[in-house]
Design a protein with these regions (language model features):
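A short SAM/SAH-binding and catalytic strip from SAM-dependent methyltransferases
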Residues: 1-6
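A short glycine-rich, Lys/Arg-flanked "PGG" loop and its adjoining helix->strand segment in the class I
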Residues: 8-23
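Short, conserved clusters of charged catalytic residues that mark active-site
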Residues: 9, 59, 119
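Conserved class I S-adenosyl-L-methionine
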Residues: 23-48
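Short N-proximal segments of mature Sec-exported proteins
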Residues: 50-52
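Short alpha-helix
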Residues: 55-78
Length: 141
């Protein structure tokens, strides 16, 4: 979840560090479909930036592929899943039951954090048809 210029810098650095044939894996926030209208894409990116207070700029699958190939990588595998980052089941799967209880306790007892989480969840739900999780494995050629 980086600004566009930072994505290229990070990918370039990964390319520099890897040996030929080395694998680079990313797991990012994505946009779907590939033909998503530019105004809709900009609106989603703007809403995300406001609610998570980071200049998050998710890309479509074809944009991720283009970015990686532009920096010298060959795509090996791409997987996508629905955006479930703030869903209870996903939190338990990611964090485990006890850690999820602690997160829940913090959300309940910290109004500022609760408001932030609720805003993020509202944005994720509003754009769930156009947001996904994307994982890409690429090889340095």
């Amino acid at each position: 979840m980086q600004a566009d210029h930072r994505k290229s810098e990070i990918i370039r650095e990964a390319y520099r560090l890897l040996r030929k044939g080395g694998l680079y894996g990313i797991h990012e926030l994505g946009l779907t479909p590939d033909q998503l209208a530019e105004d809709k894409k900009a609106g989603i990116q703007q809403e995300l930036a406001k609610c998570i207070k980071v200049n998050a700029r998710p890309l479509t699958q074809s944009e991720w592929v283009h970015l990686l190939e532009q920096e010298g990588f060959r795509i090996i595998e791409i997987n996508t899943n629905p955006m479930l980052l703030l869903e209870t089941k996903r939190i338990i799967d990611d964090e485990g039951f006890l850690r999820s209880l602690k997160i829940g306790f913090n959300i309940i007892t910290q109004p500022k954090a609760r408001n932030q989480i609720l805003k993020m969840r509202e944005v994720f739900n509003r754009f769930k048809e156009n947001m996904n999780a994307i994982a890409i494995v690429a090889e340095k050629v």
